Amino acid sequence: MKPSEAREHAIRKIKEYLERRHKQQFKALFGCLTINIYLKIFTLISTPDLCNCRLVCRKFQQLCDYNSIYVKKLLLMNAWDVTLSRKLYYESQDGMSQANMSSNTSKGFHLQSSDKKYADSDRPKLSSSSLLSLPDQKIPFPVDYSTVQGKQVVLTVLDCVSQRVEFARLDYIKVWRALAPIYRNLAYASNTIDPIAFSAFRTPEEQSKVLKYLIRFGNSYPYGTYRQAMQNAILDMASLFEQACLDEFELGLHSRNLDLLRKFSHVLHDFSGPNAYVSMYLAKQTDFVRSFFHFDPYSLFISNNLEEIHINWNILESVVNDTIKLLESESKFSEATLPEPELVQVPYAKDILGNSLKDYVISICEHIGEEETELFLVFISGFYGLCKKFFSIPNGPALVDTIFQPQIDIFISQELHYFKTVGWSLVDQWDQKLEEKEDATECFFYKNVSQNTAKNNFLETFKNVMLLPVSLFTIPSENNSASNLAEKAIEQKEEEDPELSKLDAARFVPANIYVSKDRLKHLPTTELAAQAAVLDSKLEGISTMFSLELALKIVHLCKVSLARAKVFMGTSVPQDDDIKGLSKDLFVQLLRELGQGHLKHGFDRAIEHLSSFDPRRDFSSNTVEPVVKFLELINVGDMIQQMMDSFFNEEMSPICVKDDMFDPAIAEKKKFEQLLDERAAFGLHKGINVLIEHADFLLETKTPMNLFSDQTIGSITNTIEPTAAAKNVVQFLGFHMRILVGRADHEILDVFYKEVGMRLFDSLTRYIKSHKFSVDGGLKLLSDCNLYYEFIHSLHQSSLLPYFKTLKEIAHLFIIDGKNAEEIGKLATDTSRFSSAFHTEEVYEILHSRIDWLNIKYEVDKVIHGLACCIM
């Protein structure tokens, strides 16, 4: 080994030995525990014990001077602001030197920061320029509590913590020197007079602040039975102080002493928070409000001579005005006395006044009872309208919400139920009234029949009994005077009294029956006549199946309900949504009551009566009265539909989107309109059946058997007019077409006109096939067809004109002389003339109606079927 290498090896061995020796000495000083554990232990021991540990050795002195221990204690006293401390550190970072602390020591701060530079600043060194800007950091002297300066130190000691990590130990020493003597003195005190906290500090504001500081100071003590007993003693003293302040506060409430209330409310607010004095304040105000209001629900209602109950709104208005005055005065009083008046103003309005008025409303509702639903609805909506005055004052909305929140849901359900019940009852009463009228009318006619029958039966029995002896013992003869006298007496009894015949029969008719004055002059005397009279009376009553008065009543009832509901609008979004939902439900119920309940039943009853009408009879006038009545009924239904449109535009348009098909109100309105259209169309279909059947009846009865088969050419004048049957049919249908104008929509009119035209075309086709036509008869038929064509043209239905033009072409088949049979065949096969309405087979069938068909059949068949062809 070279000398240099040997020397380096020796030096390395010496260094290893010295390092080993140094570690052994360090372990001998600190034992086997780490520095972090020692710091944790020092944090948990009391301050006097910490001072004793500091005297053990120099290393313990260094550990006891670590600022992390005192930062922890200041944190327990809630006197250390971590955020502010970090901010101050970064501001003075340029003037600080980084402390050479291990990473384990940085965990003793418990500052929860990832920045090791800030955490390692336990014992920093400041530059001379930085020291000039810092406050005096000398070890403080003991505090003299009898001087003003000493009191000021105590009252500001926790507020004057520098919030710098490097001075945490000095800050804690200041707090200890100021508060520890007072803390021990108060903890071992036997009364509330001798302790320094009450003797040196005389005002309640100073005493409350000192007590708060002492409680915070006690939180920095380590846990243990002895120290916990001292803290409990401090807390007991604080409770006594708080109770004394509450007693003074209560005294101020009783005497309405503003200065006393203002003083102790601020003391209590700073010392223990607002809960204690706010609870006492509200409790006293509850008793005052109960004594202020004297509610008597029985005096609110007034009964008139008709035993109808009304509400005395003056009483409710005075209650609202008194509440506003009380709320305003209380608001001014709390603002003048309390540090945070809103803490009592909201509970006062919501819990005290609100609950008092809520109990008043509940007592009135209980007095009203469940049977007087309308009175309940009127009261709730009316009183809510009066209470809207509360919205103009502070905390008024909360007061209104407390009063009416339990009642609004009940109001919504009851309002809908009330409208549904009353509306359907009106509809049921109307239906019952109609049924009673029909039953009364039927009974009236059958009663007359039964009276005549009973009278005839009685006279027949009287005749048999009285004449029985004569017929047994006397030979009957034409000259028998007794028999003649008896028969004359019976005939005289059967004759009507001329004086009685002069009386007006309408005087003896009940008011609830369908009987016209003309019918009263000829009352039925047989059962068959009575049945006809009952049917006619029902048909006369078709136009009264709907009642505009009933519709107006139900609409007015719905408007009243909507007006009551709208009072609750404008308070809050959820409540507005509930009221809008109620309004839509009311409108839906209105449409159902008028649609399904009234109009549908009326249409069904009218259609039933119309179906029982026999159109195959003659009328005194040229009208089918039931059809006219039904058209009038459609007109009334259209007026009710227009009422609903107007009602929707006025009441529902602000809350409904017109094209929103998912809206229940819009959907129900569409159903209502569809119901009217369907029932009107079905009724018009029945009416068309009646019109066409009567037109068939006119064609049958007004057409003589040989009208079209007469072959006397000389009797035909130069101008051939339409037949009486055609004139009557056109006049009859034209009248009903004109009367429908203005009573139905344009679409319904078009459908009605087309249906009448097509049905008339079918009837005329059957009519032509059922008669035999000569050439002269064909001319008459052509004149009739021209009249029918003009009638259809007046309806402005272009789709019907080809059919009636074809009828004119059909008439040409009859005006060609039989000698020209080949021309007749060619005309029948001309598809351009008949293809719009008839096939060739149908035209061929119509040709059978010619009176000379058998004579021309062979020639016509040759043209139509090609019988003249031959094979060469």
UniProtKB/Swiss-Prot annotation:
PANTHER family, A to Z: RECYCLIN-1 (PTHR12100:SF1), SEC10 (PTHR12100)
UniProt-listed Pfam families: F-box-like (PF12937), Sec10_HB (PF07393)
Name under which the protein is recorded: F-box protein pof6
Segments forming domain F-box: 30-75
InterPro entries documented for this protein: F-box-like_dom_sf (IPR036047), F-box_dom (IPR001810), Sec10-like (IPR009976), Sec10_HB (IPR048627)
Keywords from the UniProt entry: Cell cycle, Cell division, Cytoplasm, Nucleus
Residue ranges with Basic and acidic residues bias: 113-122
Function as written in the Swiss-Prot or TrEMBL entry: Together with skp1, essential for septum processing and cell separation.
Subunit structure: Interacts with skp1. Forms a complex with pof6 and skp1.
Matches recorded under Gene3D superfamilies: 1.20.1280.50
Lineage summary: Eukaryota, Fungi, Dikarya, Ascomycota, Taphrinomycotina
The keyword Cell division appears for this protein: yes
GO biological process: endocytic recycling; exocytosis; Golgi to plasma membrane transport; septum digestion after cytokinesis
Ranges where the record places region Disordered: 101-122
Compartment(s): Cytoplasm; Nucleus
Sample GO molecular function, one term: ubiquitin-like ligase-substrate adaptor activity
Top-level taxonomic group: Eukaryota
A GO CC annotation given for this chain: cell septum
Principal cellular location given in the protein's record: cytoplasm
